[in-house]
Swiss-Prot record:
May bind 1 zinc ion per subunit. Zn(2+) binds at residues 1008, 1010, 1019-1020. This is Protein translocase subunit SecA. Belongs to the SecA family.
Length: 1024
């Protein structure tokens, strides 16, 4: 029906492009007038455009500067300060409106200038990433359309090879004229550096400065790069700098400017694929014990080996049962036990491809799940541990606990969690136990619970490391470190770690150094970071499949840009084989055939392991080829440059799927162009489309096909049932291949299922983070004000006014003058001695005024006694140190709350609503503590004696060293294959750090390790 209306009225994208066409005509008209000008005259035209922008914005900037000067006046009243702040907010809105209007006016002129600059640069020879390059780009009309779409804050979907990098220069150049800084966001450091060097001539011609942020840069260098008119960098680097700036001790330590305009290259990769996990700055946990995984690793290795022997016996039993004419039900049970015990067993995955086997397992599983009481425990009881691969969970069985207790020579109860509620209730109900003894017994119950829960957690994480995570697939080991491989790009992710102790478990498994535990110091999700920008735009070749998510989460519209030349690439239906071995043999044979013909071929793989397997097979056939994967990425540019030459064979992970331009060599067009051979379907259709898009660029010929087997991860977990039944009905034998559009559609349905589940994960993550994001904005705004304001006196006195009102009101209700005196003395170091009769007779307001006048007089005397500069430093220190300390504690408390909130669902309560309420209560408490402690410090702090200055300087030096130890992590969630049952990624559903063992002494404000939920100082810390 939709297609019928589109034929009559035209599609949305056609209408979008039609609206822009008059602007394109105007740009081309203006460009024609620029051609006769000299280079200097063209530069002068650009300066005129810049002057128009400055002329529009300078009056507003001048008004704003005057208002900020008034705010710094020490004598300003609270009412005047509030009024001025409101005026500043209104001016900020006016500034954005004026900016948008003036840029819209000069857009045709600016784009014409950029187009003519590109024309003048033709033939210019320069260096890009150490290789000689010649400028040969002038924007086509379709590229001008893409540039207009980007400037308007939308997503420009352009087919691969249509020159997105050049398109980005148009809106970047235009918005750089404001001098506010434009950020070009790429997916990795290589592309950031390459694009900066590649596009620099256009900007350099007109004196527009261009910088790039790289992972290795120091803060001083980063600041210089951010001061440029245009800055290239990765989403992680921009995000981590934002977090670090909000932990800075002085304004000089901050590196970023305001967030004005960001253009995100490969926007689907950054805003969707990367959005399931937050950016986290973490610091070391003091006194953390890293030996716990090494201690239990030998037990787990033996347990895993025992499970392997057990599943091997089940497989032998199943193979016997499958020989019968009618499959034995016991064979189905044996196979189900293998699925639950060792789902990645190679013998098992081969059996799955046999006719009727997958259906037998599904029927058996349904039988055991059918009853309300679920008999799945009967299946699992024969195993040492049960694996749910889709949910990424592992449960130790009674048999496994028995095995571990014998190995460790410990009571099997040590591997069971005590029922805390029941045991505490029993202690409370026992009247024969004295009150002091009850406290001791409860403490023992809490201690046992904390100890055992930590041990069981570590066992589960080690079992996951051995059962669900494979070296050279999910991760690689390089230079004695476990490095995660990005499932979407195939690149190594330096600095990224699995959370909740899983990374340490993998380090123990691989016998490399186990890094220390960390705690969250600052965090933000990708979604909420990019919402900081006043204007956001993006470009990619594959956005339409996620258009609804882009609009729902980011309010970004997607506009499909027509190609400059028609796409002539031939996309063939998938070729489906029963086993991986058959598939790999077929791939090797196809590559050999193509090389003999001379047609270049790019073999796309989803993991390092597969790329190396295929490489070995091609070497055995003496086929010369290049390999590009996370282990061998140094020659990336060279390998990509050679991939389009006649007879070239390139095996690459998803690294070659984005941002790479494979140019065809001489004679290749006549051979059919580049041949794309996908060795497996990815969980995302977009990644597959990106791979196909390496061929057929700019009207070039090309071909693409995917080779799929029923043992592939996607097929095994989500899509194989229907395909297997079709193959069974058709009576396919080993080695046969099935090729049909129905099969291809079935595979795409499986991909859609995974994409929907991933969207649910991202949406849920965002719903939870939105709660923390509102709190983060309040805290970071306060902190930045504290950092940037010359004077904080008005803020301190504002806090004092509130303090006087609330404190007097609290004690006036009880008429307790002594308590009021004691509190004021303790918190402000002021002697306030109101007359008892006056206190009872007068109202709250007069008494609060008396306290305020007394405190204000004290503070003014302090300002006179202490040098101005030192007084300002005291105020700054009071604001910043208190915010930092309490915000870290708050993040820990939020982590703890988030970890257990899903259990509320068992009480018929919505976990999200419960989380919002609890988080709000914690935040109100946080603000109260921050305000009170800030005020108290501002009143109590005095300059130190010269003899103590050296000690304080040493303390500052130690704090700076600790800051260096902070680690930037983009926490890894993995794919939907490793998601929790409730659709949340494992690394997000769990706490960022495991329970700390009781021999690691917690801080006074840390949560007590006994599990009571109280702070340590209010629980077991009292005894200490």
């Amino acid at each position: 029906m939709l297609k019928f209306f589109e034929k009559i009225f035209g599609s949305k994208h056609e209408k979008d492009v039609k609206k822009i066409q008059p602007v394109i005509d105007r740009i081309n008209e203006l460009h024609a007038a620029l051609v006769p000008l000299s280079d200097d005259e063209l530069r002068a035209r650009c300066m005129e455009l810049k002057a128009r922008v400055r002329k529009t914005l300078e009056p507003i900037e001048s008004k704003r500067s005057d208002l900020y000067l008034k705010l710094d006046d020490a004598a300003i009243s609270l009412e005047d300060a509030d009024r001025i702040n409101e005026e500043i907010d209104e001016l900020a809105k006016e500034y954005e409106t004026a900016t948008a209007a003036v840029l819209e006016e000069i857009l045709p002129d600016t784009y014409a200038v950029v187009k003519d600059t590109c024309r003048r640069l033709k033939g210019h020879v320069y260096t890009v990433m150490g290789r000689e390059a010649t400028w040969d780009m002038v924007p086509y009309d379709v590229q001008l359309i893409g540039g207009i779409v980007l400037h308007s804050g939308k997503i420009s979907e352009m087919a691969t090879g249509e020159g997105k990098t050049l398109v980005s220069t148009l809106p970047t150049f235009l918005n750089a004229l404001t001098g506010r800084g434009v950020h070009l966001v790429t997916v990795n450091d290589y592309l950031a550096q390459r694009d900066k060097e590649w596009m620099n001539p256009v900007f350099e011609f007109h004196g527009i400065s261009v910088g790039v942020i790289l992972n290795t840069m120091r803060p001083e260098e980063r600041r210089r790069q951010y001061q440029c008119d245009v800055t290239y960098g990765t989403n992680n680097e921009f995000g981590f700098d934002y977090l670090r700036d909000n932990m800075a001790g002085t304004e000089d330590e901050m590196v970023q400017r305001d967030f004005y305009f960001a253009i995100v290259d490969e926007v689907d990769s950054v805003l969707i694929d990367e959005a399931r996990t937050p950016l986290i700055i973490s610091g070391p946990v003091p006194n953390a014990d890293n030996s716990k995984f090494e201690e239990i690793r030998p037990w787990i290795e033996q347990l895993v080996r025992a499970q392997q022997h057990l599943t091997a016996s089940f497989l032998s039993e199943a193979e016997k049962g499958l020989k019968n004419e009618k499959p034995d039900p016991e064979a189905g049970l044996a196979l189900l036990r293998v699925k639950r015990g060792q789902p990645k067993n190679s013998r098992y995955t081969k059996l799955l491809a046999q006719q009727g086997v997958a259906k037998l397992i599904q029927t058996t599983e349904n039988e055991y799940l059918r009853d309300k009481s679920s008999r799945m425990h009967e299946v699992d009881d024969e195993l040492y541990f049960a694996v749910d691969e889709k949910a990424s969970t592992i449960d130790l069985t009674d048999k496994g606990r028995e095995f571990l207790s014998k190995l460790s020579h410990q009571d099997r109860d040590l591997f069971l969690l005590p029922d805390v509620g029941t045991e505490i209730a029993a202690i409370d109900a026992d009247s024969s136990i004295a009150a002091p003894d009850k406290i001791m017994r409860k403490d023992e119950v809490y201690r046992l619970f904390a100890e055992r829960s930590e041990r069981l957690h570590n066992i589960a994480q080690l079992l996951k490391a051995y059962s669900l995570f494979t070296k050279d697939d999910e991760y690689v080991v390089q230079n004695g470190q476990v490095m995660i491989v990005d499932e979407f790009t195939g690149r190594i992710l330096p600095g990224r770690r699995y959370s909740d102790g899983l990374h340490q478990a993998i380090e123990a498994k691989e016998n490399v150094k186990i890094e220390g535990e960390t705690q969250t110091m600052a965090t933000v999700t990708i979604q909420n970071f990019f919402r900081l920008y006043k204007k956001l735009a993006g470009m990619t070749g594959t956005a339409e499949t996620e258009a609804s998510e882009f609009y729902e989460i980011y309010k970004l519209d997607v506009v499909a840009i027509p190609t400059n030349r028609p796409i002539v690439r031939r996309d063939m239906d998938d070729l489906v084989y029963k086993t991986r071995r058959e598939k790999y043999n077929a791939i090797a044979a196809k590559v050999e055939e193509l090389q003999k013909k001379g047609q270049p071929v790019l073999v796309g793989t989803t993991s390092v392991e597969v790329s190396e397997t295929l490489s070995r097979m091609l070497r055995a056939k003496r086929i010369t080829h290049n390999v590009l994967n996370a282990k061998q990425n140094e020659r990336e540019a060279e390998i990509v440059a050679e991939a389009g030459r006649q007879g070239a064979v390139t095996i690459a992970t998803n690294m070659a799927g984005r941002g790479t331009d494979i140019k065809l060599g001489e004679g290749v067009r006549d051979l059919g162009g580049l041949f794309i051979l996908g060795s497996e379907r990815h969980e995302s259709r977009r990644i597959d489309r990106q791979l196909r898009g390496r061929a057929g660029r700019q009207g070039d010929p090309g071909e693409s096909v995917f080779f799929v087997s029923l043992e592939d991860e996607l097929m095994r977990l989500f899509g194989s049932d229907r395909v297997i039944s079709v193959m069974d009905r058709l009576g396919h034998e080993e080695g046969d291949v099935i090729e049909h559009s129905m099969i291809t559609k079935s595979i795409e349905r499986a991909q859609k299922k995974v994409e929907e589940q991933n969207f649910a994960i991202r949406k849920r993550l965002l719903e939870y983070d939105d709660v923390l994001n509102q709190q983060r904005e309040v805290i970071y705004t306060r902190r930045r004000d504290g950092l940037k304001k010359e004077r904080l006196t008005s803020d301190i006195l504002d806090l004092l006014r509130d303090y006087c009102d609330t404190t007097v009101e609290k004690h006036h209700k009880t008429h307790d003058v002594d308590a009021l005196e004691e509190q004021v003395l303790r918190e402000l170091s002021i002697e306030f001695k109101p007359d008892r009769e006056t206190f009872e007779r007068e109202g709250i307001a007069p008494m609060a005024d008396s306290l305020y006048d007394l405190a204000l007089a004290f503070y003014r005397r302090k300002e006179e006694a202490v040098p101005e500069e030192i007084m300002r430093q005291i105020e700054k220190y009071a604001v910043l140190s208190v915010i930092d300390k309490h915000w870290r504690e708050h993040l820990r408390e939020i982590d703890t709350l988030r970890e257990g909130i899903n259990l509320r669902a068992y009480g018929q309560k919505d976990p999200l609503l419960e989380y919002k309420q609890e988080a709000y209560n914690l935040f109100i408490l946080l603000l109260h503590e921050i305000e009170l402690e800030t005020l108290s410090l501002a009143f109590k702090l005095f300059p130190v004696h010269p003899d103590e200055a050296g000690e304080i300087e040493e303390r500052r030096r130690r704090a700076a060293i600790q800051q260096e130890k902070l680690m930037a992590q983009h926490e890894e969630a993995g794919s939907v294959y490793n998601a929790q049952p409730d659709g949340e990624p494992e690394s997000q559903a769990s706490k960022q750090q495991p329970v700390v063992a009781d021999h690691s002494k917690p801080g006074r404000n840390d949560l007590c390790p006994c599990g009571s939920g109280k702070k340590y100082k209010n629980c077991h810390g009292r005894e200490a």
